[in-house]
UniProtKB/Swiss-Prot annotation:
InterPro entries, sorted: CASP_dom, CASPL-5
Record Pfam families: CASP_dom
Binding partners and assembly: Homodimer and heterodimers.
Entry's transmembrane regions: 39-59, 71-91, 116-136, 156-176
Topological region Cytoplasmic: 1-38, 92-115, 177-179
Membrane topology label: Multi-pass membrane protein
GO cellular component: plasma membrane
Keyword Cell membrane part of the UniProt annotation: yes
Protein's name in the database: CASP-like protein 5A2
Extracellular side: 60-70, 137-155
PANTHER family membership: CASP-LIKE PROTEIN 5A2 (PTHR32021:SF16), CASP-LIKE PROTEIN 5B3 (PTHR32021)
């Protein structure tokens, strides 16, 4: 049995009129505020950087922080957090300026993993520093010889930086999991 097959002929779109204005790229519905490439995401990155850098500077300004491992860990973790947040803030500024979405699967994976690692390190360092600060202040009662105010301030700033980093991680992880 010989059956004829329909042939498909491509149909070209008529050329766009020269008077039409090209629409700028728009933000997808998936881009909730707080995600990378949004204004709230940029604000979260800015506050992460600000508080992590402040914690780093306050702790590094004391002369005896290198003698305690937890305080050295806090300096390293907040240094990493501030560099990560600053780099991603610059990426967010670029994405906002050119109106592009940062919802590429690989980018979201990178952001989620990086945010998870840096926020976990910052939280662990803040907890360790808080433990040492409580030991020095309450248990040993030796704040007169130490920089307890700077230690407590730096620890509090590290916790605030973690509070700003946690939503970024959760938004990126949620975006990655919902694909």
């Amino acid at each position: 049995m010989n059956v004829s097959h329909a042939s498909v002929h491509p149909v070209e779109d008529p050329p766009a009129a020269a008077t039409e204005v090209e629409n700028p790229p728009r933000v997808r519905m998936d881009d909730m505020e707080g995600m990378p490439g949004t204004l709230l995401g940029l604000a979260l990155r800015f506050f992460q950087f600000l508080f992590a850098a402040a914690a780093l500077c306050v702790m590094a300004s004391t002369s005896d922080f290198p003698s305690v491992t937890a305080f050295c860990y806090l300096v390293a973790a907040t240094g990493l957090q501030s560099l990560w947040s600053l780099a991603l803030a610059m990426v967010d500024v670029y994405a906002i300026m050119v109106k592009r979405s940062l919802q590429n699967r690989r980018l979201v994976s990178l952001f989620a993993i990086g945010d998870g690692v840096t926020s976990t390190l910052t939280f662990a360092a803040a907890c360790a520093s808080a433990g040492i600060t409580v030991l020095i202040d309450n248990d040993l009662n030796s704040c007169a010889q130490n920089h307890c105010v700077q230690f407590e301030t730096s620890t509090a700033l590290a916790f605030i930086s973690w509070f700003a980093a946690l939503p970024s991680f959760l938004f990126n992880f949620w975006s990655l999991a919902s694909r």
